[in-house]
Amino acid sequence: TVLCGSDKYPVKDPFVELVKGSLNTFLNAMTYPEKTIYPIASCNDKDFQNLMSVYMDAVFHPNIYKYQEIFQQEGWHYELESEDAPVTINGVVYNEMKGAFSSPDDVLSRQIMTSLFPDTTYANVSGGDPLHIPELTYEEYLDFHRRYYHPCNSYIYLYGDMDVAEKLAWMDEAYLGKYEAIGLDSEIKLQKPFEKPIEVTHKYSISSTESEENNTYLSYNTVIETALDEKLYLAFDILDYALVSAPGAP
């Protein structure tokens, strides 16, 4: 929702405007259980600076504090199509997550993470569970942004043929230097190993025309070291591609 306009760029959807009018070679925003990233790239230095300005302003000065409608549009709100119609819940992310929760593959992937890492942030769904999204209030939403969308809780990477010192000085003067340091512990502790194997059974929805027969998923999951072991991570990435993802994989 931070990409729905900001103090300096009060347009409804700056992302769409950048896609249409910039020289970017990459432009996106992605959410994960433990982070959200806002990557940009351009071969033109002036364009890259413009992209930096739009994204920094979006992250640190979004219009969400001015317009509750952004939360209602992207998160959730009640709708009534007519006086006789039932009250329904609508919202961009809410509808996206309803779709994700109706996909057996997505349901299985979430259950794998939840069962392996129940005591960590990886047990959570970054987009939210549609059953619980309507429980989120506007005030809680703003409090989350104030606490976590802070320079002390961010990593900013610059890479390429540029004057890095100039970029850092601009970021400090325009944004980072205007914040006070806060104590924020973002460490993600490792999941405590289980004392014995655990079995989990979970139901997923099917259409009225589908049969329950031969429609069961079985998954065996185990934790192997951490993603910080680069060689092991790469080895299993290759193994996954060879056994599962590659054309003709068994």
How should these model regions be labeled?
Residues K35, P62-E96, D163, G183-P197:
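Acidic/histidine-enriched alpha-helical segments
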Residues V2-G5, T36-C43, W76-E81, P130-L131, ...:
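Second-shell loop/turn segments in exported
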Residues K20-S22, T31-K35, T88, F117, ...:
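Short, solvent-exposed loop/turn segments at the edges of secondary structure
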Residues T1-D57, H61-P62, Y67-I70, S102-D106, ...:
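M16/MPP (pitrilysin/insulinase) zinc-metallopeptidase core fold and M16-derived inactive scaffolds
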Residues Y155-T216:
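An aromatic/glycine/proline-enriched structural segment found at the starts
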Residues I206, T216-P250:
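Structured mid-domain segments that build the active-site/substrate or prosthetic-cofactor binding neighborhood
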Residues N95-Y155, Y175, K189-L190, T226:
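Histidine-acidic residue clusters that define the catalytic metal-binding segment
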